[in-house]
Every structure is written in C-alpha cells, then in structure tokens.
Amino acid sequence: MTLALTVFAVWMGATYALEGAPRTLLRPEAAGLRVAYAVVANLLVGVVGGGLVVRHLTRQGRLTAVAAGFGSGRRSAVATAMGFALGAIVYLLQGPPSLHPIVLVNGFAQVLPVSAAEVFVCWAVVGAAVEASWRPRQASPVIAALVASALFGVYHLAHSPPFNTWTMVGALTMVGLGTSLFLFLGRDISGTIAFHNALALFGVLRALGEAGVLGRYETLQLPLLASAIVTVGAVLAVRRLIRS
C-alpha cells in the first residue's frame, strides 16, 4: 500500500505543477504545457510508473494481473467496445456541451492521457492494492471501489478551476464510483479507460464552454492527437509488459 500511495502522491504533485498551477487545460494556446503535462504527469508518472508498480506487485504475488485489469486480449477487445458504447450513451444523456465532431476529437484526445493515468493510478494501482490487502473478505472489492473513487475525487484539488473545489471533489467521487463499477465488474484497463474518458470529456468540454474558449477547439490540434496516439501505445506496451 505504501508504494501505491507514493505513486498517487507523486502523480498528484506533478499534476499540480504542470496543470493546476499554470491553469493549462483552460488555455488552448498553451500547447507546450499541455504536452508536458500529458507526457510527464500522465504518461511517465501515471501510466508507466503505475504500470511498473502493478508489475512489481504481480511479480511478488501480492495481486494478479487480471485483478488489476490486465486480462486476455479478447476480454480487452470486448470491454473496450463496451466502454466506448456506454461512454457515448452517458455523454449524450447528460446534454452534451458540444456535438461538433472536431471539438469531440480534440477534447477526447486532450483528456485521454489524463484518463489513462487516472485509471492506472486510482484503480489499477491503489484500487487493486486495497482489494488485495483486504482479501479474503467478501467486501474487498467494495472497499477498493470506495477508496479508489475517493482518491480520484481528492486528486482534482491539483487541477484547474472549476475542478479544484471540495464540491467538485464530492461530485467527482460519485463519478468515480461509475468507473469503479465498470472496472471491478469487467476487470479490464482499456475498456475502463474508454468509458472513463467519455465521462471526463463531458466535464472538460463543459468547463471550456463556461470559460468561453470552446470555439478554439473547432480546428484539429495535432499536438493533442499526437499525445493521444502515444498514450494508446504506452497503455498497450505496459499491458504487454505486465502480462509477459
């Protein structure tokens, strides 16, 4: 648990330094900062760092790869399709802030590195570690879901407004429960990221709309697309490493 919580603390600190303090996600013109935030805080610390912790814990026999969300390729393909489908439904049912296709592509690409890191750190690392530490109690998945969701909410204090308030922490903890339900039932990291990213997309686009900068996302932003592609590659590489 100490190692898992250390990863969480380092990731939250990096998030504040590269996103929360400079208000990166509210500044569409800050392409360099967005790339730095995506690469350092999310890819290196969140995905790669979190993945290495999962690999370490599985090698020590403290948890299984499947329990952390790294099952078979077939499970992953099915879960990812379900994650995209359910995520799209939830996005539409909430009254989407935008249906502009380019805005959706840019927004999805912008939040993907963040969503991947959130799922890796809060659920694959901390959630799985909590569940393993409470076994063989039947309530272990419930306890893990509650802890992971609460930490997901608290982590947003390191973000830009309007996410860095205790009201948002409470609301996002409830959102985290939906992600917990998807992960602990489906046990797949890729599907959970797809579902979670759709939830994050709604929140980020709404915040951009309230800030009056959503229109700037109507042109494809190549740095965002590149960071999303790198994120997918990193997730697949870490998944292969854990299962090797």
Regions found by a protein language model. Give the residues of each.
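Juxtamembrane "helix-exit" motif on the non-cytosolic side of transmembrane helices
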Residues: 17-28, 89-102, 155-162, 205-212
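Juxtamembrane cytosolic interface motif at the C-terminal end of transmembrane helices
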Residues: 52, 90-94, 235-242
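Helix-boundary and loop/linker segments of multi-pass membrane transporters
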Residues: 69, 95-105, 137-139
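Transmembrane helix-loop-helix hairpins at the membrane interface
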Residues: 108-243
